[in-house]
Amino acid sequence: MSTLVNTTRRSIVIAIHQQLRRMSVQKRKDQSATIAVGQMRSTSDKAANLSQVIELVDRAKSQNACMLFLPECCDFVGESRTQTIELSEGLDGELMAQYRELAKCNKIWISLGGVHERNDQKIFNAHVLLNEKGELAAVYRKLHMFDVTTKEVRLRESDTVTPGYCLERPVSTPVGQIGLQICYDLRFAEPAVLLRKLGANLLTYPSAFTYATGKAHWEILLRARAIETQCFVVAAAQIGWHNQKRQSWGHSMIVSPWGNVLADCSEQELDIGTAEVDLSVLQSLYQTMPCFEHRRNDIYALTAYNLRSKEPTQDRPFATNIVDKRTIFYESEHCFAFTNLRCVVKGHVLVSTKRVTPRLCGLDCAEMADMFTTVCLVQRLLEKIYQTTSATVTVQDGAQAGQTVPHVHFHIMPRRLGDFGHNDQIYVKLDERAEEKPPRTIEERIEEAQIYRKFLTDIS
């Protein structure tokens, strides 16, 4: 009898282990996807370059890739500043329409690593992400300009290219949260770290590295960015001679978060490399090497300025109160701005921290930097909307300073000529408002927040 029981128990244990293994394998499948990184040699012939892109899409599809990453200048490489401006198009142009149709017909995401986007007398170097429906999922405009002037050489990218104004938040895709960068951005670690902090698990650096700098630094930099951010890194590259003056290094790569090279197109002129991106490995890596948990935000901090706000997804605590997400019109990493229950002047809003802490001195370095950045952004927003040139910005830091809600927050109040008989009377009104002014309705506050949110979207 005992033998039968033991055999039955062993059978049950084996069955459970087999089921767990199947579940583990299925989980890995659900979290993994095949991606392709392309390599090409663009010239000033846009039609020929498009033919190369079509060929790379075909190869990516044949390898069952759900996403193809193309290099910087996948549209063309101009032979002069004048030609570059002449060949550039807007994102609503004919070439972009062809790219979008290509993504839609093949049901594949495409990273257009750097197209020349027309912008008045200059261009933007724009990294455009298309989804499988051919829609624009995101546009990032290159931040860092390669400007060098020496006795031997004068090379100023900013003569032709207008630098971008902000980082773009990571984009949700079938292969994870993707952080968008371009070429020379690779030499700056700060954006990569910020993108990881914002949720990126894959960084992409489409490039046209020169032969000399590529040979010296390309692989080292890609692996460094992967290791320090614990992200997959994908870098599509141009290769070969584009014209008599310009040669690119090539070696399109996919790098793992551990710094291993998963794919390298080497020196093939038209090629793709593929790799399986398995996001399940990230959690294990974060647990065994929790570098981002060990960052000393009380000693140093990185802050992304002009970052576009996400649509608020949850209500926020304000001490023991709850701020309805519909009244929040801006969110940063650590702070949020919302419309006020009782206003001293029209446009009186509040900025507070996501973490509940009563005093300004209780904020860490990252929260302080983010708080003041957010306050300045909101102040500029209100002055544009209400056509004013002044604002009272104040924080009542503690009960004896007039704080009634024990959660650090700034009051931002647009000022107008003659709005108070005596300028400092605004502080008296600030203390009196709880007794004297009735609370505004939730509908009023939501409507006001929608106006501010739309304005932020439009100026972005």
UniProtKB/Swiss-Prot annotation:
Entry's EC annotation: 3.6.1.29, 3.5.-.-
Write out the function statement from the record.
Answer: Cleaves A-5'-PPP-5'A to yield AMP and ADP.
Protein name per its UniProtKB record: Nitrilase and fragile histidine triad fusion protein NitFhit
The enzyme's main class, written as a single word, is hydrolase
Domain CN hydrolase, which positions?
33-279
Reaction(s) this enzyme catalyzes, per UniProt: P(1),P(3)-bis(5'-adenosyl) triphosphate + H2O = AMP + ADP + 2 H(+)
Q: Does Protease appear among the keywords? A: no
Active-site residue numbers:
E72, K142, C183, H409
State any single GO MF term: deaminated glutathione amidase activity
- Alphabetical GO biological process terms: amide catabolic process; nucleobase-containing compound metabolic process
What is the organism lineage in this UniProt record? Answer: Eukaryota, Metazoa, Ecdysozoa, Arthropoda, Hexapoda
PROSITE patterns tied to this protein: CN_HYDROLASE (PS50263), HIT_1 (PS00892), HIT_2 (PS51084)
Keywords for this entry? Hydrolase, Manganese, Multifunctional enzyme, Nucleotide-binding
One cellular component term (GO) for this entry is: cytoplasm
Give the record's family classification: In the N-terminal section; belongs to the UPF0012 family.
